[in-house]
Amino acid sequence: MVTKKEFLEELTNATNEAIKAADKNGDNQLSKKEVNDMYKKCKYPNPTLATNSLFELFDLDKDGKLSVNEVKTAVLVDYIIEAETCLKKFVDIIFKADSNKDNKITWDEARQYFITSGSNEAQAKVLANSMFEDVDSDDDKCITREELREYAIEYFEIYPTE
C-alpha cells in the first residue's frame, strides 16, 4: 500500500516533470501560452478553453502563472474527482443486488445477485459468504453503501495510507 509520504513524493516528481516538459523559459512555472502550446502539441480539443479553465480554477494567486504547488493541486483534485467517480460507479454496480431498494444488501440479496450474474448456487453462496466476511465491518448481516465504499478504498488502495 502506498503511504501519503510516498504518494506526495510521486505527485511532486510527476508535477516537476510535467512543468519541465512544458516550461519553455525555464522559470519553473507555466504561463498561459506555455500551457496552451502544450495542449496544442497534444492535439487537445479546444486548447484555449482548456487553458483558460485550468487557470481560472488553479491559478490560486491569480498571477497568470501556474506554480508547482498550483499544478499539484490541480492534479490532486483531478485524481480525487476520478477516484470518487470510480468509487460511486463500483458501489452503484454492486448495489444492483439491493433488490428491495432499502440501501442495504442482505446475504440472500447478494447470493441472488451472484446467481443472476451467472454463478451457480454453490458458487453464489461462496461469493456471498466471502463478500460478507470482507465487507460487513459491523457484522450486522447487512452491507451498506458506506461499508462497500470503505472496503473498495482499502482493497483497491484508492487513497494513500498514513
Curated annotation (Swiss-Prot):
**Matching PROSITE patterns, A to Z?**
EF_HAND_1 (PS00018), EF_HAND_2 (PS50222)
What's in the keyword line of the UniProt record?
A: Calcium, Metal-binding, Repeat
GO MF: calcium ion binding
Task: Spell out the Gene3D superfamilies in the cross-references.
Answer: EF-hand (1.10.238.10)
The record ties this protein, via Pfam families, to: EF-hand_7
Q: Do you know which SMART domains this protein is assigned to? A: EFh
Entry GO CC? extracellular matrix
Q: In what residue span(s) does the EF-hand domain sit? A: 10-45, 46-81, 85-120, 123-158
Keyword set includes Translocase: no
Q: What residues does Ca(2+) 1 bind to?
A: 23, 25, 27, 29, 34
Please tell me where Ca(2+) 2 binds in this chain: 59, 61, 63, 65, 70
Residues noted as binding Ca(2+) 3 in the record, renumbered to the chain: 136, 138, 140, 142, 147
Question: What are the coiled-coil residue ranges?
Answer: none
- Known PANTHER family for this protein? CALCIUM-BINDING PROTEIN, RETICULOCALBIN
The identity of this protein, by name, is: Calcium-binding protein 4b
Gene name of this polypeptide: cbpD2
